[in-house]
């Protein structure tokens, strides 16, 4: 039976480098591919080596005392849960286990009162040390994945050389089999396409047209998703004509304006709008009530959680006092204790090393004791007096009371209400048009005064809008109203009596509109707006007369001539006649009038105009030049005169000085 070789063992430096290169190429998921490059290691061992040692995120620095203390406290809280402890400390689980074992072994050598080995934990970390525990010859190397790599030998084995060469060849090949096959297929398709194009070009040169499409009819009818766009809607070419839409919109607007002008806005729309507003107000009110209810429930939950936290609080356990009254010397004696000495002693008394030693001893003591399940006589458990937890009904009543007290305190802060009740009575004008309320308003006595007034205000606004629609069309369309004095007087002798009446009525209406909307100071007789009944009667009479009138029907004329040979011959003969007439008229004009004389006079006039333009241009240039020279001369004259004035002033000053000197000399 051949020997079975088990993969594993110490990791060498060559294997580590191969593993790093393989991870950089294959990633952190294809461990079977990575392990295929390593002859003596499996996929699980390769993954463990990367996660335990080669990962650059691993902290391999020396353990600090704070980390040791944290490790011991976590080992006490989470026994044997090293996978959970490792991410909290920031190291691997294996390193945590080894450090924990090292700390337990170090406590065997340290006495309870001895201080000679206090600094034993300051040496190198577990990473640079051999396996923990007492190692003997022949012992197994546990967790080789978390140990440093074995250095390479100068003369490597043939097996290692073969593994290194194979890994180098495979890792250098960045293009796999699939990529090579795809590239080869693309090259074949390109060569086929080029050969087909060459064949088609040769056949076309020979006079034979061959299509590149498939010859299969079924295949040819399928949709080509590479060539075409599915569900494509092509827009119309050029500018889109929207004249029809604009005309339809205009007609619809005119129809609506006519309907409103004749019938007015129906009250049903106003009622629906008012009903919609009431529904929205009710909905907002309900939402506000729901929100307040939710806030109350949230406040109740907060109170409940707070009470639960208070119930869960445990009794505060303080450490035993270090100094008692018996050991403390009396005040004022020579052996009294200084306060500063006590504070420094208390602060340095329990250092980090002492805490680490205490924690390790306690852990070892717990490991030494047998389980309570295996012991014959179980130790008596001290009875602790615990406060009974209140029932759910009591808790519910308690937080309800707290919420009610909170609400009462908030309501108590509100200001006192002002009960000033007043009734606003509507004032009615006797000349005003009577407004009929709806049946709902008249019959329902439960509607309050504010709602009734609001309905009356809506009806009043509706009447105002109807009154605006009964004005003249010029005012409704906001057209400019001309001044009455700018109107032209018509000739009464040439117009009929009906036209004269229409003109007078139009003038009176124009004066009234001008005084109402343009110039209130303009004095004229104002015309009151028609009431709704008169307006309806007038519109009915106009529509009745329009219905009785016969509308003139215009026959549509075609702008195209019939396309026949007879019509074409008539058009050609007509064109010949027009051509002969135009030539005869041209000959008669040329015979009676000397055209050359007109051309000569035209040329002379153009020449004179050109000469005058040139002279005008030169005169303009000279004028600009002389103007510029004048400006420069004025500036220079001003500067020269200023300079000469300064010289004269200097001469006068010098003359005065000389005269003073002469006077002084004469006096001396």
From Swiss-Prot:
Q: List the disulfide bonds.
A: none
Instruction: List, alphabetically, the Pfam families matched.
Output: Myb_Cef (PF11831), Myb_DNA-bind_6 (PF13921)
DNA-binding annotation, residue ranges on this chain: 31-54, 82-104
Extract the ranges annotated as region (Disordered): 111-190, 262-293, 322-346
Major place of residence: cytoplasm
Q: Coiled coil located at which positions?
A: 158-202, 599-635
One Gene Ontology cellular component: cytoplasm
Organism superkingdom:
Eukaryota
Compositional bias of type Acidic residues: which residue ranges?
A: 152-161
Keyword entries, A-Z = Coiled coil, Cytoplasm, DNA-binding, mRNA processing, mRNA splicing, Nucleus, Repeat, Spliceosome
Q: Where is the HTH myb-type domain?
A: 1-58, 60-108
Q: Name one GO molecular function term.
A: DNA binding
Its annotated compartments are:
Cytoplasm; Nucleus
Q: Which portions of the chain have biased composition (kind: Basic and acidic residues)?
A: 270-289
Q: Which GO terms describe its biological process?
A: mRNA splicing, via spliceosome
Query: What interactions and quaternary structure are annotated?
Result: Associated with the spliceosome.
**Job description of the protein:** Involved in pre-mRNA splicing and cell cycle control.
Q: Which family does it belong to?
A: Belongs to the CEF1 family.
Descriptive protein name: Pre-mRNA-splicing factor CEF1
Can you name the source organism? Debaryomyces hansenii (strain ATCC 36239 / CBS 767 / BCRC 21394 / JCM 1990 / NBRC 0083 / IGC 2968) (Yeast)
The gene that this protein is the product of is CEF1
């Amino acid at each position: 039976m051949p020997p079975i070789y088990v993969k594993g063992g110490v990791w060498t430096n060559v294997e580590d480098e191969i593993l790093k290169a393989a991870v950089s190429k294959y990633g952190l998921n294809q461990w079977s591919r990575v392990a295929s490059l390593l002859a003596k290691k499996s996929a699980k061992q390769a993954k463990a080596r990367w996660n335990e040692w080669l990962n650059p995120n691993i902290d391999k620095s020396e353990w600090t005392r704070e980390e040791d203390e944290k490790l011991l406290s976590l080992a006490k809280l989470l026994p044997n849960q090293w996978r959970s402890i490792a991410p909290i400390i920031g190291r691997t689980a294996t390193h945590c286990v080894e450090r924990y074992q090292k700390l337990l072994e170090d406590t065997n050598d340290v006495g309870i009162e001895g201080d000679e080995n206090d600094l034993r934990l300051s040496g190198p970390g577990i990473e640079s040390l051999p396996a923990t525990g007492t190692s003997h010859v022949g012992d197994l190397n546990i967790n080789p994945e978390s140990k440093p790599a074995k250095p390479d030998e100068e003369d490597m084995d043939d097996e290692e050389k073969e593994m290194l060469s194979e890994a180098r060849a495979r890792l250098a090949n960045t293009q796999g089999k699939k990529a090579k096959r795809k590239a080869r297929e693309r090259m074949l398709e390109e060569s086929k396409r080029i050969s087909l194009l060459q064949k088609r070009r040769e056949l076309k040169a020979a006079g034979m047209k061959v299509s590149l499409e498939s010859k299969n009819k079924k295949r040819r009818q399928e949709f080509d998703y590479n060539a075409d766009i599915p569900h494509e809607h092509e827009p119309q070419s050029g500018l889109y004509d929207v004249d029809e839409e604009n005309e339809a919109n205009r007609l619809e607007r005119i129809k609506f304006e006519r309907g409103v002008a004749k019938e007015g806005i129906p009250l049903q729309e106003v009622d629906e709008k008012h009903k919609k507003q009431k529904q929205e107000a009710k909905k907002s009110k309900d939402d506000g009530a729901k929100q307040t209810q939710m806030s109350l429930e949230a406040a109740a939950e907060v109170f409940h959680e707070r009470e639960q936290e208070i119930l869960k609080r445990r009794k505060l356990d303080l450490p035993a006092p270090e100094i008692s009254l018996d050991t403390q010397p009396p005040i004022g004696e020579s052996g009294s204790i200084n306060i500063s000495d006590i504070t420094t002693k208390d602060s340095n008394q329990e250092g980090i090393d002492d805490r680490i030693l205490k924690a390790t001893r306690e852990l070892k003591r717990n490991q030494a004791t047998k389980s309570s399940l295996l012991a014959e006589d179980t130790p008596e458990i001290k009875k602790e007096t615990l406060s009974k937890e209140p029932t759910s009904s009591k808790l519910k009543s308690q937080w309800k009371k707290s919420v009610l007290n909170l609400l009462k305190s908030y309501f108590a802060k509100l200001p006192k209400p002002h009960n000033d009740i007043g009734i606003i009575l509507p004032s009615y004008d006797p000349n005003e048009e009577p407004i009929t309320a709806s049946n709902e308003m008249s019959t329902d006595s439960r509607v309050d005064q504010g709602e009734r007034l609001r309905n009356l205000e809506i009806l009043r606004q509706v009447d105002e809008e109807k009154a605006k629609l009964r004005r003249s069309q010029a005012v409704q369309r906001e057209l400019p109203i001309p001044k009455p004095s700018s109107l032209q007087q018509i000739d009464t002798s040439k117009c009929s009596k009906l036209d004269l009446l229409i003109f007078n009525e139009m003038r009176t209406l124009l004066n009234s509109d001008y005084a109402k909307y343009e110039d209130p100071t303009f004095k004229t007789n104002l015309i009151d707006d028609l009431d709704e009944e008169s307006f309806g009667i007038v519109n009915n009479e106009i529509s009745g007369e329009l219905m009785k009138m016969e509308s003139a029907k215009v026959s549509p004329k075609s702008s195209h001539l019939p396309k026949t040979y007879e019509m074409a011959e008539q058009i050609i003969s007509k064109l010949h006649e027009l051509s002969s007439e135009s030539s005869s008229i041209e000959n008669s004009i040329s015979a009676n009038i000397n055209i050359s004389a007109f051309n000569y006079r035209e040329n002379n006039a153009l020449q004179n105009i050109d000469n005058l333009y040139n002279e005008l241009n030169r005169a303009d240039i000279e004028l600009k030049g002389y103007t510029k020279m004048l400006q420069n001369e004025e500036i220079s004259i001003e500067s020269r005169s200023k300079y000469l004035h300064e010289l004269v002033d200097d001469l006068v000053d010098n003359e005065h000085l000389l005269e003073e000197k002469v006077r002084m000399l004469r006096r001396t």
